[in-house]
Amino acid sequence: KFVVFSFEYMTRNEYLHTERFEFEGGGSIDGLKVVYHTSENGWRKGDTRKVIWICHALTANSDAEDWWPELVGKGKFFDTEKYFVICVNMLGSSYGSSGPASVNPETGKPFYFDFPLVTVRDIVRANILVRKHLGIDRIDLMVGGSIGGFQSVEWAVMEPETIRNLALIACSCRATPWLTAWEESQRMALE
């Protein structure tokens, strides 16, 4: 059976941070850019819709309607008309948010290996910048898969008064030594 999905209920947005962004592991950048997708009807002050914040997995992007078409969109489980649905592109990825392929304003060339090491806490801090920019005071449901799940856990620790509920997929609250070694071997393979 061939299924055609219509992707028209999420809108791409960009947030440009005007202050220097300091990374947890050291280093900083000016002009941090964070790309995100939201329900077509944006968030306004006094909005009463429930907020669903999706933290994507490593290889996805902020267009959750594109990679999760069965769940995100008008009339779907994460109904973009009934709820305010948002997904922020992960800091350091290649889908628009600042990362190694971004141009270093000091050199005029891509950062590549000079881009600061990005931690989960850095990713969450970039998400929090977008949350504050939009004026969102509460997140009714945060959904995160894989590294998005780790972001969700970290965010719940950083802002427990903001996050009401978590739905975590393929993640845990801590990494075992085996998992740490496995991830390091993957990182080494990429280098």
Task: For the regions a language model picked out, list residue spans one by one.
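Aromatic (phenylalanine/tyrosine) cluster motif
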Residues: 2-9
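Ligand-binding pocket scaffold of soluble enzyme catalytic domains
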Residues: 9-191
